[in-house]
Amino acid sequence: MNINFTLLAQALAFAGLIWIIATKIWPPLMNAIEERQQKIAEGLAAADRSQKDLAQAQEKVNEALKEARTKANEIIDQAHARANQIVDAARTEAITEATRQKDLAQAEIDAAANRAREDLRKQVSALAVTGAEKLLKREIDANAHKALLDELASEI
């Protein structure tokens, strides 16, 4: 066998192999690689979008929680304010009722004191009449001297 012929045959076989690979195998292989690259790029883009969506959702959740806390604090503040209003109203009502009862008691005390004064005036008038009877040793007509007795009673 001739070495030149062998080299030529190998060169032709190699060239044929290159041509077959370049026309039959290489294009589908490159298409498969490009499709795979596109799928990987789409997957990475989808992952990025998912991360962005997750970050946005997390922000929305945080904002919703913040808003819920704010509303809860407002409701609690309103409840405290309402409780304070109720306590103040009850306190005002209690003070009003206590003042009313105190005024009623004071009126009863004043009425009792006036009755006691009147009773005391009557007793003093009776004592004065009795004392005057004893001093004068005669009976004083109470009807005749009523004006005098009333004047004495008012002075007492």
Curated annotation (Swiss-Prot):
Keywords: ATP synthesis, Cell inner membrane, Cell membrane, CF(0), Hydrogen ion transport, Ion transport, Membrane, Transmembrane, Transmembrane helix, Transport. One of its GO terms (molecular function) is proton-transporting ATPase activity, rotational mechanism. The chain crosses the membrane at residues 3-23. SUPFAM superfamilies: F1F0 ATP synthase subunit B, membrane domain (SSF81573). InterPro entries: ATP_synth_B-like_membr_sf, ATP_synth_b/b'su_bac/chlpt, ATP_synth_F0_bsu_bac, ATP_synthase_B_chain. It is a single-pass membrane protein. It comes from the Bacteria. It is found in: Cell inner membrane. One of its GO terms (cellular component) is plasma membrane. HAMAP family: ATP_synth_b_bprime (MF_01398). NCBIfam families: ATP_synt_b (TIGR01144), PRK05759.1-2 (NF004411). Belongs to the ATPase B chain family. F(1)F(0) ATP synthase produces ATP from ADP in the presence of a proton or sodium gradient. F-type ATPases consist of two structural domains, F(1) containing the extramembraneous catalytic core and F(0) containing the membrane proton channel, linked together by a central stalk and a peripheral stalk. During catalysis, ATP synthesis in the catalytic domain of F(1) is coupled via a rotary mechanism of the central stalk subunits to proton translocation. F-type ATPases have 2 components, F(1) - the catalytic core - and F(0) - the membrane proton channel. F(1) has five subunits: alpha(3), beta(3), gamma(1), delta(1), epsilon(1). F(0) has three main subunits: a(1), b(2) and c(10-14). The alpha and beta chains form an alternating ring which encloses part of the gamma chain. F(1) is attached to F(0) by a central stalk formed by the gamma and epsilon chains, while a peripheral stalk is formed by the delta and b chains. This is ATP synthase subunit b. The lineage of its organism: Bacteria, Pseudomonadati, Pseudomonadota, Gammaproteobacteria, Lysobacterales.
